[in-house]
Amino acid sequence: MAPISIADIVAALPAEDTWGPATSTDNMLQGVPYAPFSKGDKLGRMADWTSESKDQRTGRQAYNRNFRDQQVYGAGSSNLFSIQAAEDESSFSVVDNTRTSAKRTFGRGGGTVFRGRAQRGAGQRGGRAGFQRVGAGRGQGDRFYDNRGGRSNRGRRFGWKDYDKPQRTREPSVNVRPDWTMLEEVDFSRLLKLNLETPDGEDVDSYGFLYYYDRSYDKAPVKGAERRLQSLDRAAYNVTTSQDPVIQELAEKDAATVFATSDILSMLMCAPRSVYSWDIVIVHQGNKIYFDKREGASLDLVTVNENAIDAPLELAESSAKQESINTPSALAMEATFINHNFALQTVAESQDAKVDMKNANPFYNASEETEPLASKAYKYRRFDLSLERDEEPLNMVVRTEVDALLKNPVNGEDQQLIVKALNEFDSKAQGSGNALDWRSKLWSQRGAVVATEMKNNSLKLARWTTQAVLAKADGMKLGFVSRANPRSAAGHVVLGVVGYKPRDLAAQMNLNLGNGWGIVRTIVDRIRALDAEEDEEKVKKYVLIKDPNRPVLRLYSVPANTFEEDEEAAAEEEEQKAEEDEE
């Protein structure tokens, strides 16, 4: 039998007939084939064999609407090749008797978007300090969003319109110059693992005098008779370490190897709690190390709500003229003014009840100063930072400060106090950190008020507590000062005072002093290791900077004359201003 040819089979098929379903006359429009379609269909290709399929894509592209398959013309209508049902089922429906709940939606005004946070420059005389000007704007893609640490590996939770919030970028407290060399970068997670148990220390010498604390401030104020905060002219000094004449004398006597002041050391010991940028100058001369602060540093200013989630905004970012008194720099100047005057007002200035230290104030010159001295005692204390492996002991001398005395009602002994003040600017304003209204809640819900302050001002309270422990003070007095008018920073009232023991307050705040001493010892060891092979007589200078946008410390090696020109220029400006005032 001859083989069958496929060509013969195809040729034998009827020419007038076509393969596939029979053509319906309903799909003909004036003799032209017509396919029903929907106006909502997208125009596309009949078939595209070159584009990648949805199954070939991975990751987020498989679900991205920009990468969906092109729809074929008429795909939104009924299937042309579907089986027609014998009966019309278009009128058939199923009744759903399940109970549905209304979905709650938020309107346009349901949320507020806050953009950025920064600092603005401002200086002050006497413990001069300031914030650097920072502009607002979006950061780079690899920048942290207002990073507080702790959630870097697990992401972060997003809130209402969080996508529309720009990253909060800040500038460093001091600009890094081209001739600086970065030696090391340490993140806070590594610093938190350090620990060094250090004894309480011993007193080396004491200077100044103290007045007794006025106990009437501990009582709840009578309604309608609030005490106004007074502005008192008293001379108080906050000299940097290397310019302290007492420390210079102790260094010549080899009383210690490392020298610092309590305000500088407390910032270093509480560094993992900081958010804003700060810097410390470290000078290594011979075998002595000095922790200094530069001219115009921000260490002396008291920040407000630095650790709050919704911290105060700069004027350029908040774009509200009436909020100019609630910017970070303005609030810092206001808080510094409040702390200075509150410590002076809460003591009873009486020459009969004045207690002198062993030596007079080392910074006061009666021939030049016209203002009387403030109640202040400077205690120089020595701490042992030695380890078992050290061949020679490593001692550190710290200048600490005490503000007032208090009689112990039991044994009648004098107790040394540190007096500080927390300030409230406006509980309803942006940047308040969801704080309670102090006027109505301070005495009825004091625990909640203090807990909120510990959260919003974690660094500030930790520094004050550390300074009290370094000074071996017997107690702390925390005042609560509020504005007389929330829209004005001119007048303030004292709402109350709460007393704490430094160690108890440190335990409540989960403040680990051993971790702080571990940070100090690590920095000292690093400086000594860098200069091990250098000439001992050569002066080496370093700058330790807190990164403004990340929880990181950076150590830079700088020329020995760094910041000296700035100090000379500042001194010349002061002389010119003094001459103009005299004229």
Curated annotation (Swiss-Prot):
The lineage of its organism: Eukaryota, Fungi, Dikarya, Ascomycota, Pezizomycotina. HAMAP family: eIF3d. mRNA cap-binding component of the eukaryotic translation initiation factor 3 (eIF-3) complex, which is involved in protein synthesis of a specialized repertoire of mRNAs and, together with other initiation factors, stimulates binding of mRNA and methionyl-tRNAi to the 40S ribosome. The eIF-3 complex specifically targets and initiates translation of a subset of mRNAs involved in cell proliferation. In the eIF-3 complex, eif3d specifically recognizes and binds the 7-methylguanosine cap of a subset of mRNAs. Residues 563-583 have a biased composition (Acidic residues). GO terms for biological process: cap-dependent translational initiation; formation of cytoplasmic translation initiation complex. Residues 298-312 are annotated as: RNA gate. Belongs to the eIF-3 subunit D family. GO terms for molecular function: mRNA cap binding; translation initiation factor activity. The keyword 4Fe-4S does not apply. This is Eukaryotic translation initiation factor 3 subunit D. The RNA gate region regulates mRNA cap recognition to prevent promiscuous mRNA-binding before assembly of eif3d into the full eukaryotic translation initiation factor 3 (eIF-3) complex. Keywords: Cytoplasm, Initiation factor, Protein biosynthesis, RNA-binding. Residues 116-150, 561-583 are annotated as: Disordered. Component of the eukaryotic translation initiation factor 3 (eIF-3) complex. Residues 140-149 have a biased composition (Basic and acidic residues). GO terms for cellular component: cytosol; eukaryotic 43S preinitiation complex; eukaryotic 48S preinitiation complex; eukaryotic translation initiation factor 3 complex, eIF3e; eukaryotic translation initiation factor 3 complex, eIF3m.
